[in-house]
Amino acid sequence: MSELPVPELPVWMGDVDPSRIGFPLPVDKSRYAKEVGLVYKETGRGPLHLDAYRPRDAEHAPLVVMIHGGSWHQGGRYEMGLTRWAGYLASAGLAVVSVDYRLAPETRYPDSFQDVVDAVDWCVEEAAALGADPERIGLWGDSAGGHLALLLATSQTRDDFPGPRLRAGAERLRAVVAWYPPTDLVRLHELASRGEGGSGMVRGFIGADPEAAPGRWREASPLEQAHAGAPPALILQGTRDLLVPHTHTARYAERLAELGAPHEFHLVEGGVHGFERVGPGDEARALIERARSFLRERLGAAG
């Protein structure tokens, strides 16, 4: 049998050994059923899809909505290790949906965020078919997906948020897990402009410079929307992240602490962007397990 090719890694992963890429924990596929390509929304650019993972031994299971990363410009529900992640959660008794959303630069904020909001509303309406409890919803996202997950969790539980809103009500949002998430978009844009890290794709997502649309930049930043009543958050970040500097994410955690908002913040020494898929070793595995247990605890999963 020939060996699998070693993938080429993007420059922002630094000097990680490519042979270490992969999801480090086992997934028991016998414990869940998967349905792919469900249409949750029609748009002018075609339908938007999600994949559903339903635990075989659980009815009315807590639901986790997974939002992929890719700097808001690329990626999809079937990429970036999400299928393994979804299976890992579903095998622990959590119903999971992994969603697509329209990408920049063709789609700008708030339309891509509206897609994520609409996906949650669709899941509430279709909860019975998903084997899910619509009153217990958790959010999960990595990178840009972590940003959208945090924005959804913080904004929808405010009365004064001017952007897209859930029809179903925000009280059902019980927890959010965000891996290396952009949280202060203006700051991230400034860092990228000076060549000090950060993603230069933020402007493409917003569609204007901060000076031209300051309200839109503030509206789209979880740091600006954070408040004490937001759902509990688990935030995970590496110190060698070249896209989302760890000081950026630490500032968000500090803001949550100042507000008295429930949260956990884990900073992984030497962790790169995507560290849970490339190490470092035992700590990454422990944090993956913690992410699953956090969702189970906060959503009240049985067993």
Regions found by a protein language model. Name each.
Residues 1-303:
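Alpha/beta-hydrolase superfamily serine-hydrolase fold, recognizing
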